[in-house]
């Protein structure tokens, strides 16, 4: 399967060229779109029971004001929430996209021309097909972005608009405009995925670890193995174990503990954070909206022996 990947940047985003991280950002965006295109091709082939070929996928930074074809041929606008950043993105299907897919599903060649543009002409079948495709796209992008981007990111389809005027869309806002073009039989279909340009700032704050890269961060692994130094840990995700401070159990009671026993804790809100067996910070533990929250009060210098028992100094 031959696929063409095109990366372009419009004049509206010329400032991006000044960024020293632009090359890295492009590489990450290339990998994300290439990975998604492969996954979507497999999904679409299975869904339509037809051969699906990727024609091209492109990225450009711009607004809908300078890319009016995106909204003038709109059939449905899917509003996507990017969590936890609370950013809004959009997946836009043009006219004939859903109708051609339905035509293929019912044995046609995908060359059906839908000339209706009224909201009442949106069928329940189109809504169901849109929902199924959107579920795959959001799930796929969530998983792919977690591999190349940040672990906590998720895409959620919150609402679908079949009338562009019903959503207060900012035509001048800059987006990463991702266009995916596929061929089914002899019919080409495409859709656009608009991701806010501001999402790039989160890329700059993270260190990318691709699952396709063979290298390992041996420096961090070595530092954790020998000693934990907060100066050596940055832009990485680590597993931290929290231990409660102030719990005491008598020697005799340890051997008589049973399910249901209640143990007294002097300071139930005090905890010490550990990486492996090394204490790294002191903090307060709270429960808020069914979530466990830790407020870090002080970092512990692992090179100083005087801090080894510091977590007990406030008893």
Swiss-Prot record:
Subcellular location: Cell inner membrane; Bacterial flagellum basal body
Protein name in UniProt: Flagellar motor switch protein FliM
Principal cellular location given in the protein's record: membrane
GO molecular function, one term: cytoskeletal motor activity
Gene assigned in the entry: fliM
Keywords carried by this UniProt record: Bacterial flagellum, Cell inner membrane, Cell membrane, Chemotaxis, Flagellar rotation, Membrane
Lineage: superkingdom: Bacteria
Gene Ontology CC terms: bacterial-type flagellum basal body; plasma membrane
Organism of this sequence: Buchnera aphidicola subsp. Acyrthosiphon pisum (strain APS)
One record GO biological process: bacterial-type flagellum-dependent swarming motility
Membrane topology: Peripheral membrane protein
Family the UniProt entry places it in: Belongs to the FliM family.
Function of the molecule: FliM is one of three proteins (FliG, FliN, FliM) that forms the rotor-mounted switch complex (C ring), located at the base of the basal body. This complex interacts with the CheY and CheZ chemotaxis proteins, in addition to contacting components of the motor that determine the direction of flagellar rotation.
Keyword Membrane set for record: yes
